[in-house]
Amino acid sequence: GLLAQSSDNNSLRFKVAKAIKTKTAPVIDGILEPLIWKKAPIIDQFVQTEPVELGKASEQTISQILYDDKHIYVAITCRDSEPEKIKRVLSRRDSYENGFGSNSDWVRVGFDSKNNDQSATLFGVNAAGVKIDVAVEGHQNYDVSWNSVWDVAVSSDSKGWYAEYKIPFSIFQFDNKPDMEWGLLIG
């Protein structure tokens, strides 16, 4: 199976998330089909970064990871006690200044497929469905001009909003071993 570790340099560093191989790929529509996603372990030990670094999250976030021979699938549930206040900003793809940051509710998943703490690929989406993808080298070099073909869809209801990702393995550089360990960031 695919195993991921958090990429944080503190006590969160060695939290483990396990991805489960699936025979049935989810339909990427932002609606998390229970029959597909129930197989994937729940990742729910998230903390906030603002206003209190590593403080208890003010709203519940849940993530799950599946994979098949060609893709990684990630589901993220963002609970919101005031769903009418979810910020949905339309912008151009990769426009962090306009569609992300504090302007919009958004999530990202990042993979360090070499598990070397030196490179990663980040995939983000805001609550309006606008995408951002970034290649990271080192700790300061973020290349927003890097673009790849991947799919994500969002939906919302009275409990919050949801993101459902489909990312091809062909994007990543990795050694194809039975028990891979990748670095992982979900936020």
Task: Label every model-predicted segment.
Residues 3-187:
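Structural preference for beta-rich elements and adjacent junctions enriched in aromatics
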